[in-house]
């Protein structure tokens, strides 16, 4: 990460896409996408996905590291080009507990991530705990972030410190996506970004963490990009000019969250304006969902009814029976909720792919289609972009390849934005 940031600050139009997903096909897609380049691949886990208690994936930080390394080994991707990051590391998962208890758990969270070899650490103590006022005083946020940094510094070996980097600050949306519709988004004011830096510098120095300040590579801000279930707010460079100008005077860059579904040109403009780290998550699993839905339509055309996977029906059954991951996010009317379940841009379906019934039905879908020839016309009907790539000779028409390539459509847009010589 340090090299990428240094090159950006030296004037190169260079950024990096941060893949924030725990889905094996998404991770495989990202690694295969850059397998034959010299690029680093940044894969991040969030504190609610992966923590010392397992998170919703059931993985602790060391488990997630081994999970990613296992996929890298399968596809032949060299570990030295992998960067592992931890996102929103702090009391996010324990906001309903008193601050002292939540911070104790947050310190252990940081230690677990660093001990497992994660080298990009987002120190995010911005959320109020059960006995805190709302919003938190910025100096309290900074002092808590400094405590988390101290935990990282005491855990990291000298070798790890060569690569260890920190990100500070937070964006407006809650981690995991908006729970309600958005009409506009507040662009971070440059004076607020400056205050974030100043308060963190003071808090770090108060704990003797002067050396660690040199490892702070980025500040999370809101450049004016967001999405909810049905809408996308696109980047407007003119609205963030003052913010872009301010960061030039520092040794840091910005990290932008919720950049999913922006245009290729928007990604290029964001990197030009010093948002050199672009987070993406739901857009990748949205593409995965689109691919599986498309393959399910092909299955309906090619496989006899009694042999089909029923994957779409199984997804509906599981999500309606176990609505915990989507109920408070989606519209209450049944017909509208079904549209959201299937097609929402916030893609709450992503939490259900590991479910045993859904996983088995997806496996059967792929097995069924592996046993037949996929007609080009059928691929054109349901996956027209992949049909074009088949015609160009860069893709072989297997179900697995079609899913991977569909996910890589998203990564192609980020590559355009992050790399100046990509047309």
From Swiss-Prot:
SUPFAM superfamilies on file: Aldolase (SSF51569)
Pathway given in the UniProt record: Carbohydrate metabolism; D-tagatose 6-phosphate degradation; D-glyceraldehyde 3-phosphate and glycerone phosphate from D-tagatose 6-phosphate: step 2/2
GO biological process: D-tagatose 6-phosphate catabolic process; galactitol metabolic process; phosphoenolpyruvate-dependent sugar phosphotransferase system
Swiss-Prot/TrEMBL keywords: Galactitol metabolism
InterPro entries: Aldolase_TIM, GatZ/KbaZ-like, GatZ_KbaZ_carbometab, TagBP_ald_GatZ
GO CC terms of this entry: plasma membrane
Family recorded in the similarity comment: Belongs to the GatZ/KbaZ family. GatZ subfamily.
PANTHER family tied to this protein: D-TAGATOSE-1,6-BISPHOSPHATE ALDOLASE SUBUNIT GATZ, N-ACETYLGALACTOSAMINE PERMEASE II COMPONENT-RELATED
Function of the molecule: Component of the tagatose-1,6-bisphosphate aldolase GatYZ that is required for full activity and stability of the Y subunit. Could have a chaperone-like function for the proper and stable folding of GatY. When expressed alone, GatZ does not show any aldolase activity. Is involved in the catabolism of galactitol.
Subunit comment: Forms a complex with GatY.
Protein name (database record): D-tagatose-1,6-bisphosphate aldolase subunit GatZ
Species of the source: Salmonella choleraesuis (strain SC-B67)
Gene name for this UniProt entry: gatZ
């Amino acid at each position: 990460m340090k090299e990428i940031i240094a090159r950006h600050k030296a004037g190169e139009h260079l950024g990096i896409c941060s893949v924030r997903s725990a889905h094996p096909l998404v991770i495989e897609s990202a690694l295969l996408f850059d397998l034959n380049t010299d690029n680093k691949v940044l894969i991040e886990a969030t504190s609610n996905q992966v923590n010392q208690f397992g998170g919703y994936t059931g993985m602790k930080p060391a488990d997630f590291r081994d999970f990613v390394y296992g996929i890298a080994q399968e596809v032949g991707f060299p570990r030295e080009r992998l960067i592992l990051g931890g996102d929103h590391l702090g009391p996010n998962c324990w906001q309903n507990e008193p601050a002292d208890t939540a911070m104790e758990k947050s310190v252990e969270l940081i230690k677990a991530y660093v001990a497992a070899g994660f080298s990009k650490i987002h120190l995010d103590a911005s959320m109020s705990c059960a006995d805190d006022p709302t919003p938190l005083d910025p100096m309290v946020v900074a002092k808590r972030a400094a405590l988390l940094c101290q935990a990282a510094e005491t855990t990291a070996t000298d070798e790890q410190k060569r690569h260890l980097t920190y990100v500070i600050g937070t964006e407006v949306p809650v981690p995991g996506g908006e729970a309600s519709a958005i009409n506009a988004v507040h662009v971070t004011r440059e004076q607020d970004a400056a205050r974030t830096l100043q308060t963190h510098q003071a808090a770090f120095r108060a704990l003797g963490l002067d050396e660690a300040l040199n490892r702070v590579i980025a500040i999370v801000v809101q450049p004016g990009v967001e999405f909810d279930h049905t809408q996308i707010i696109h980047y407007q460079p003119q609205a963030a000019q003052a913010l872009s100008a301010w960061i030039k005077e520092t040794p840091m860059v910005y990290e932008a969250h919720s950049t999913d579904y922006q245009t290729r040109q928007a990604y290029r403009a964001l990197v030009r304006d010093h948002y050199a780290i672009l987070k993406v998550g739901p857009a990748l699993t949205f593409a995965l969902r689109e691919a599986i839905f498309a393959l399910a339509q092909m299955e309906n055309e090619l496989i006899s009814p009694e042999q089909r996977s029923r994957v779409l029906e199984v997804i509906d059954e599981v999500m309606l029976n176990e609505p915990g991951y989507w109920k408070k996010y989606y519209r209450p009317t049944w017909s509208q909720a079904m549209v959201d379940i299937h097609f929402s841009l916030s893609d709450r379906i992503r939490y259900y792919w590991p479910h045993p019934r859904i996983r088995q039905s997806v496996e059967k879908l792929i097995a069924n289609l592996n046993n037949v020839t996929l007609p080009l016309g059928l691929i054109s009907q349901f996956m027209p972009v992949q049909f074009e790539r088949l015609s160009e000779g860069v893709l072989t028409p297997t179900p697995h390849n079609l899913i991977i390539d569909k996910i890589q459509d998203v990564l192609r847009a980020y590559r355009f934005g992050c790399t100046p010589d990509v047309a």
